[in-house]
C-alpha cells in the first residue's frame, strides 16, 4: 500500500480510525503547497479556522520521504515565527495535514500589486530573521528561503512555511552537502555540493531581500539551469537602484561567497537597516489590504473573460510558487544526483504536463559519453584532475534532465560556430 510507510513514520499522526471529513469542514481551495493542494477549513470541534493540506499518497509515492521530512520538522518546531502544525489524518490514500491558517498571503503575493517600501521590507526581513534564529538555534536549516515561503496572517504576523526540504544538523554532523533548494536563491556552496550549514539560509535571505525590493530574484530572466552555473562562478549579486545604503549593505553582508563571513541571523537582527526601519507587524496589514483589493480587481477582470483560467492564490500554510522561475530541487538519492537527475517540484511538473516532452539528445550516447571517456583516459595517463571532468559531464546530464534536447542544440551550435570560425580564417594562425 502506498500509505503504509506514512502510517508508522509520521509524528502527530492521529487515530487512524478518525475520519477527517467528520472532524473538519473543507472549504475553498486557497493554494498549492509542496506535495499537495491547500484548503481553508474549519475544525468542527472548536470552530477554529485551519489550513488543510491534502496529499494523495498514491500519486505522491515518490515524495513520501519528503512529506515525512516536512511534517517531522514542523512537529518539532514551537515558535511564533514558524507555521504551526496541528496533526495528520489518513483516509484511504489521502493524507490530511492540519496546519495553522494564515490568510494574509505570502510575501510573494504582496509584491503582486506593486513594490514594497523599505519599512515594509525591513519589517518582513526582521520577522524572517527571528524565524531563522529560532531554526538555527534548533540546528535546523530551512534550505528554501524565498518570498513564496514566507506567509502572513491577516494581522500581519510573518511566519516561515514549506519545510519540504528542511535539514537537521546533529552534534556530530555540523554541515550538510545535499543539493536542495530553489536555484535562484541557492548559496554557491549548496550548488557546488560542498559542506554547508545555516549560513546557506543567510545567502537565501539576501536574495529574498533583493526579491522584496525588486519583485524578483537576480537572474530571473535566465533558465534555472544556467543560473546554477552562474552563481558559483560570478561575483555575488548586489542591490542596484534607488535604495538606501543600509539596505544595500544588508544585502551585501548576506551575499558573501565565503559562508563564514556571513553574519548569523541573530547578528543581522542588530543590523542598522533592521533597527532603523522595521516597525510592528501590524504595519503590514496595509500591504495585505492592498493585495486583497488588487486580487478582487483581478478576479473582476478575469470573470469578464470566458476563457480565463486563473486559480485562486490566497495563501495559507505551505507556500506556493507562482513564477515560472520558481521551483524547488528536493533531496534525492545521492547516486542519482551524481548521474545528473534532477527532481522538480509538483508545480513545475504540472506546468510541463501539457508540453510535449522532447526526447533526450542523441549526442549523449554518440558524442558526449565517448568524448568524456576519452578525456578521462587521457587525464589519468597524465595525472590530471578526474573530478573536474566528471563534474562537467554531470552538469551536462543535469541540464539535459531539466531541458531534454539541450545537448543536441549545444553541439549543433558549436559545430556552426566552428565552421564560421574556420571560414573566416580564424584558424589561419594554426597552419
Curated annotation (Swiss-Prot):
Active site: 144 (proton acceptor)
Source organism, top-level taxon: Eukaryota
Cofactor: Mg(2+); Mn(2+); Co(2+); Zn(2+)
Motif (Nuclear export signal (NES)): 323-374
Record site: Cleavage: 313-314
GO cellular component, one term: cytoplasm
Modified residues (Phosphoserine): 4, 308
Keywords: Acetylation, Apoptosis, ATP-binding, Cytoplasm, Kinase, Magnesium, Membrane, Metal-binding, Nucleotide-binding, Nucleus, Phosphoprotein, Serine/threonine-protein kinase, Transferase
Any Pfam family hit: PDCD10_N
Keyword hit for DNA-binding: no
GO molecular function: ATP binding; metal ion binding; protein serine kinase activity; protein serine/threonine kinase activity
Post-translational modification: Proteolytically processed by caspases during apoptosis. Proteolytic cleavage results in kinase activation, nuclear translocation of the truncated form (MST3/N) and the induction of apoptosis.
EC number: 2.7.11.1
UniProt: ATP binding residues: 30-38, 53, 100-102
Catalytic activity: L-seryl-[protein] + ATP = O-phospho-L-seryl-[protein] + ADP + H(+); L-threonyl-[protein] + ATP = O-phospho-L-threonyl-[protein] + ADP + H(+)
UniProt-listed InterPro entries: Kinase-like_dom_sf, PDC10_dimerisation_sf, PDCD10_N, Prot_kinase_dom, Protein_kinase_ATP_BS, STE20/SPS1-PAK
Binding site for Mg(2+): 149, 162
Protein task: Serine/threonine-protein kinase that acts on both serine and threonine residues and promotes apoptosis in response to stress stimuli and caspase activation. Mediates oxidative-stress-induced cell death by modulating phosphorylation of JNK1-JNK2 (MAPK8 and MAPK9), p38 (MAPK11, MAPK12, MAPK13 and MAPK14) during oxidative stress. Plays a role in a staurosporine-induced caspase-independent apoptotic pathway by regulating the nuclear translocation of AIFM1 and ENDOG and the DNase activity associated with ENDOG. Phosphorylates STK38L on 'Thr-442' and stimulates its kinase activity.
Complexes and interactors: Monomer. Interacts with CTTNBP2NL. Interacts with RIPOR1 (via C-terminus); this interaction occurs in a PDCD10-dependent and Rho-independent manner. Interacts with PDCD10; this interaction is required for the association of STK24 with RIPOR1. Part of the core of STRIPAK complexes composed of PP2A catalytic and scaffolding subunits, the striatins (PP2A regulatory subunits), the striatin-associated proteins MOB4, STRIP1 and STRIP2, PDCD10 and members of the STE20 kinases, such as STK24 and STK26.
Protein name: Serine/threonine-protein kinase 24
Organism: Mus musculus (Mouse)
